[in-house]
From Swiss-Prot:
It catalyses: O-phospho-L-seryl-[protein] + H2O = L-seryl-[protein] + phosphate; O-phospho-L-threonyl-[protein] + H2O = L-threonyl-[protein] + phosphate. It comes from the Eukaryota. This is Probable protein phosphatase 2C 59. It comes from Oryza sativa subsp. japonica (Rice). Its EC number is 3.1.3.16. Binds 2 magnesium or manganese ions per subunit. Belongs to the PP2C family. Gene3D superfamilies: PPM-type phosphatase domain.
């Protein structure tokens, strides 16, 4: 047993030398030099280092969306988000995502720029949406790993995404960003945080030849606090980008969806988040409320919140400023 622990410690030390700024390891991550901009489906976005919010409506009037994002107490911004409302083969498709990077912003920005672009091109987007999503996660991860060959610092990202196709809502997730819906007034988690101490995740990692050990929290190889992610090429054998996908029917009982990075969920429960959003019809204001509450409760991480409100059961749409629209 002593030999196993010693070997594990040596492996951890070796990995730490390759993960100098992994935010899943330390809150005091070194600031990434090339954070870039957070952009929203081609709109003028907010600079990655400053708080921003915005939103809009679908052309068919069936849903509204709003987002709010801030670096919080961190000096660097590794959260990204994306919202798109695209017409594909005559169908309106809504795509929403929150991407929380670690080891810098590089991986999260790549996923934000490529995941939905790849998905709307998938030939099975309508005929087999779940397969299309799963295959797109995998192929986008492969593209990221190829792009990462020129970097000597490892980087990765979570992804919590929601796809609206007709009366179907499909939520896919890797990592510890989270999706929660309000249905019939109840808070329901529609994603699972991927942590290495979960029995099935730990078994999968160990079956692949890896190990999970305690280093402040349970970590893959003693380094990474999430068990699934995009990127993380040095741990890719164990840290997969295979999403868990859940489908919900969009009907009159489905009120809204919240997607958020762990900067929210570390300090706000699912039930609290739903209770905060429920009385606020304006999706942007709802997202801002969540962000403000997380900040007031002392969240130590970047905070990104995205709210999608389903409007078929509403009698009217709340007014929104015209400057949220594309210029």
């Amino acid at each position: 047993m002593r030999e196993v622990l010693l070997l594990g410690s040596l492996v951890v030390l070796a990995l730490l030398s390759l993960f100098p700024c992994c935010s899943c390891l330390s809150q005091g991550a070194e600031e990434e030099e090339d954070d870039g901009e957070v952009r929203l489906m081609g709109l003028a976005g907010e600079a990655a280092g400053s708080p921003g919010s915005g939103g809009g409506f679908s052309a068919n009037g069936k849903f509204s969306y709003g987002y709010a994002s801030s670096p919080g107490k961190r000096s660097s911004m590794e959260d990204f988000y994306d919202t798109r409302i695209d017409g594909v083969d005559g169908e309106t498709v809504g795509l929403f995502g929150v991407f929380d990077g670690h080891g810098g912003a590089r991986a999260a920005e790549f996923v934000k720029q490529n995941l939905f672009t790849n998905l709307i091109k998938h030939p099975k987007l309508f005929s087999d949406t779940k397969s299309a999503i799963a295959e797109t996660y995998t192929s986008t991860d492969s593209e990221l790993l190829k792009a990462e060959t020129s970097h000597n610092r490892d980087a990765g990202s979570t992804a919590s995404t929601a796809i609206l196709v007709g009366d179907r809502l499909l939520v896919a997730n890797v990592g510890d960003s989270r999706a929660v819906i309000c249905r019939g007034g109840d808070a329901i988690a529609v994603s699972r945080d991927h942590k290495p101490d979960q029995s099935d995740e730990r078994q999968r990692i160990e079956d692949a030849g890896g190990f999970v050990m305690w280093a402040g929290t349970w970590r893959v190889g003693g380094v990474l606090a999430v068990s699934r992610a995009f990127g993380d090429k040095l741990l890719k054998q164990y840290v997969v980008a295979d999403p868990e996908i859940k489908e919900e029917v969009v009907d009159s009982s489905l009120e809204f969806l919240i997607l958020a990075s762990d900067g929210l969920w570390d300090v706000v429960t699912n039930e609290e988040a739903v209770a905060m959003v429920k009385p606020i019809l304006d999706s942007e204001q709802a997202a801002k409320k969540l962000l403000q509450e997380a900040s007031q409760r002392g969240s130590a991480d970047n905070i990104t919140c995205l709210v999608v409100r389903f409007l078929e059961q509403e009698n009217h749409l709340p007014e929104r400023p015209t400057n949220d629209q594309a210029s």
